[in-house]
């Protein structure tokens, strides 16, 4: 009579224990990573000459992957591939490799982020545990999803969205509910560890109060569709640059070296220093109602940075791109610029990652629940127009956005 409930309870307890371990590891590594990137950003800002190291930084990053991490340049796509295929273990060396090269990329001034790197660091530190425990392929997939949740929730300060992101990101059109409990536990534990260590997250402005009306409904819906096209443009441009480098530059270390030279020329010649790194000041300025930034510049520099092989991630640059695009759109339609900037940040991210639920939750956790309806509408609209291939090209398509189920 009680055999089945007891078996289920033991199964859940086992995964809760695994998730706590993953969450603690993820939180500790994310805390160190946040502090390191804060140092690298402050050092670059205080010493403007660091921009001249972009080419040599690119060479170091490329050589590190070529000689120490061949095959690991797939980044977060490696993790998603392994969730589906179980063909190879995520090696531990990816954690220090991504950590080091991300810090170098930010120190020199590449337009990159941190969330993608944090996922790889967490997975690199935890997948060897799965190997040591002898987990079967199905359980190992759950552990990788748990690591993604722990990494995202702890690095971004969004424990609910971090868990949902991990459940949503590996397949377009399907959520892995079997990983629900460990994903939430790991994400919340990782976030708690970072908080407990006294590491500060970026403080974002809260979305202004908006009265829902037919006017705001069509404006947000239209902008969501535009945000999806912006996301699609970023994805296609990054893929084009990556393909161009692969076709014409055989020696991998030369790719980020060339990327560094291009970035150096563009940034210095055009006066685009504000678009280096995370570009938090530009993002926050837009979210406070300013229209001084150009989203197309951030999009271009990020596509070059990532496409040529620098390391870090796309999430925060996409938030910045979306915020700047939202401010421009809000000004054009005569709307509240701050509202459109905040909504734009999560909408462009939703389109680029194919994770509309997680991105709507990111909006709620970072910018306040008062914008829940706006975030939901914009993220769904962006998801609809951004295509099936996002920044994580290893995503499987379980259901087309037209509604057709494939698997």
Task: Give the ranges of each region predicted by the language model.
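Alpha-helical transmembrane segments and immediately membrane-proximal extracytoplasmic
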Residues: 1-407
């Amino acid at each position: 009579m009680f055999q089945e409930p007891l078996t289920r309870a033991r199964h859940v307890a086992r995964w809760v224990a695994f998730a706590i371990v993953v969450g603690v590891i993820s939180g500790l590594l994310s805390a160190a990573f946040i502090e390191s990137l804060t140092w690298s950003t402050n050092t670059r800002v205080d010493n403007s000459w660091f921009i001249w190291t972009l080419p040599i930084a690119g060479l170091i990053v490329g050589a590190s992957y070529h000689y120490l991490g061949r095959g690991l340049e797939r980044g977060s796509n490696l993790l998603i591939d392994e969730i589906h295929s179980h063909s190879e273990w995520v090696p531990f060396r990816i954690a220090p490799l991504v950590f080091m090269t991300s810090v170098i990329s930010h120190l020199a001034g590449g337009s990159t982020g941190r969330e993608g790197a944090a996922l790889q660091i967490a997975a690199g530190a935890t997948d060897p545990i799965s190997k040591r425990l002898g987990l079967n392929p199905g359980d190992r997939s759950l552990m990788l999803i748990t690591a993604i949740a722990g990494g995202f929730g702890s690095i971004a300060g969004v424990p609910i969205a971090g868990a949902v992101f991990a459940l949503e990101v590996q397949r377009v059109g399907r959520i892995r509910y079997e990983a629900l409990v460990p994903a939430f536990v790991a994400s919340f534990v990782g976030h708690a560890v970072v908080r407990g260590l006294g590491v500060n997250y970026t403080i974002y402005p809260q979305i202004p109060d908006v009265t829902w009306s037919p006017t705001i409904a069509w404006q947000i819906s239209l902008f969501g569709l535009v945000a999806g096209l912006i996301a699609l443009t970023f994805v296609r441009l990054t893929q084009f640059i990556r393909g161009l480098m692969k076709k014409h530059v055989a020696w991998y270390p030369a790719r980020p070296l060339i990327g560094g030279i291009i970035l150096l020329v563009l940034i210095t010649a055009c006066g685009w220093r504000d678009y280096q790194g995370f570009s938090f000041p530009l993002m926050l300025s837009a979210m406070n109602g300013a229209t001084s930034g150009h989203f197309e510049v951030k999009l271009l520099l990020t596509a070059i940075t990532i496409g040529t092989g620098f390391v870090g991630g796309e999430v925060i640059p996409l938030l910045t791109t979306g915020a700047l695009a939202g401010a421009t759109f809000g000004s054009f339609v005569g709307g509240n610029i701050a509202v459109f900037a905040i909504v734009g940040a999560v909408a462009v991210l939703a389109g680029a990652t194919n994770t509309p639920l997680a991105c709507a939750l990111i909006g709620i956790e970072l910018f306040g629940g008062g914008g829940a309806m706006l975030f939901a509408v914009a993220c769904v609209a962006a998801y609809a127009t951004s295509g099936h291939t996002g920044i994580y090209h290893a995503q499987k398509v379980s259901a087309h956005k037209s509604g057709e189920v494939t698997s």
